[in-house]
């Protein structure tokens, strides 16, 4: 028999869990740049960044699901679902959804990545309640009807065809496959013609129910927003939908993942009749939680992050071998990529690859000059600040930070971390990352003799 005091204690404990928890994560001056987080009963997190001086606001909902979470048979399901959430809810048609935001001059969109999905709307601050209502309705009330699945299949197949027609885009999918193979990280976010054709409404509904629980979601809003008002409206929308049914549920922790990069030295070529050959030479990089990522950012900027970078100067400015040449990094939960892209005439592929490989090897052995590091630090700091000048970028930053790291970092702290990078830090990460044996992906009209020599670039 349960005692009265025990029952009261249990009720008190349950009520305590049901109370929303609010924290100030970054305290801005005079409220400008203040970031707050509220965790609702049911595990839904809401983060906001307040900028009273602007007239706009961006509202988004991030889902802890990407193409990495798909089985081979479900490849493309995350992106397919992203499309379907715009097709109608219990109270809005697809036209109602789009016209609501169009009517106030706003913009609305979504994107799917390998480890997350985001739906967002950018509007005037006075129209923020509308944006919240529409986006929350999409996430909690979508119908995912058979006829919509059939119609949207055609649009997605055209999107796949459009990507295939752009070798400069397609080569990045090829490089992911070169590095990760048939692992989910190596498969295209859009899926393939075969997998998209095989997906059914029932399978997509099951995928939706599994991955769009409130514990898997992060709500983010930035601009001229009132945190408490955003929380009240979001909570009302999710409670009305019945989504917050378990008050004791806790938010999903940031993804841990598992290392999946394949052995180095792989070469993949897709022969295609194009004017240019598109190449990516790269190797395993750093996970997004790796503390060396700040030094890696400086290294990447100096190597191929701008017109003064080594690769741009050597490949384009001095020799005119390519119009587009750059380096980039991609960080996932447990692994990463570093790549160098170039588009060039097929006859000059080997020259371009040799120059790029020589530069990577030289920097791996000798590092960068102090002047290069200083310039890269300044460039990275400036681009970081300039990249956060609109509310959409701010919403992306706080939403992704909450989902992927479970914490927030102020812009000042980010700039300080970049400034703290030393030449020794850069040399160490260059030896580690650039010292690894590279792999190579190529799309273009290479002849047999040219193709047979591609392995020289990764030897």
Curated annotation (Swiss-Prot):
Principal EC category: hydrolase
Keywords for the protein's UniProt record, in alphabetical order: Hydrolase, Metal-binding, Metalloprotease, Protease, Zinc
Residues binding Zn(2+): 79, 83, 159
Entry EC number(s): 3.4.24.-
Protein's UniProt name: Uncharacterized zinc protease SCO5738
Protein origin, superkingdom: Bacteria
A GO molecular function held by the record: metal ion binding
Cofactor note: Binds 1 zinc ion per subunit.
Cited PANTHER family: METALLOPROTEASE, MITOCHONDRIAL-PROCESSING PEPTIDASE SUBUNIT ALPHA
Biological process according to GO: proteolysis
Keyword Transferase: no
Stated family: Belongs to the peptidase M16 family.
Active-site residue numbers: 82 (proton acceptor)
Cofactor(s) demanded: Zn(2+)
